[in-house]
């Protein structure tokens, strides 16, 4: 139909990191199979940072090192140091704040995060494992992928 517009996305990536540039190209190829037009903007460090800070992107490939307490505040809180492109008033951010204040539980936050999906982790450089007796998990995890069924974990 002539009146239909094709969905078009711009992915911003730092060209100085070959792994991230390759990831952006791979995502582009996958999305184009779904008939989504994708432009990958491979930028030098200075231009990349400026593009991300300005919000002139649909997606960006970035890297975040979480603090030892695994706080998502830099991503989900208003004024967070890496909250680029994230609606810090959205459902995930609101649920995270409620969880931190103790007025809501972890499952409610996870459900809101999954529905809102403010960011998508593409990979993890190193994994950690924690355990509490209240954690109930399936048996699909494996030594090479301890988070394989994280979406089914529950706290009781």
Language model: regions and residue ranges:
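Ligand/substrate-recognition segments at binding pockets and active sites
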Residues: 1-66
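Short, solvent-exposed loop/turn segments at the edges of secondary structure
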Residues: 4, 55, 70-71, 87-94, ...
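Short, low-complexity, polar/charged sequence segments that are solvent-exposed and flexible
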Residues: 28-34, 60, 78-82, 139-144
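Glycine-rich loops and low-complexity Gly/Arg-rich segments
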Residues: 35-37, 63-67, 83-88, 145-150
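Extracytoplasmic/peripheral linker and loop segments enriched in polar/acidic and small residues
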Residues: 39-48, 73-136, 156
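Ligand-binding clamshell of periplasmic/extracellular solute-binding protein-like
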Residues: 60-73, 125
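Tryptophan-rich aromatic "cage" segments
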Residues: 133-156
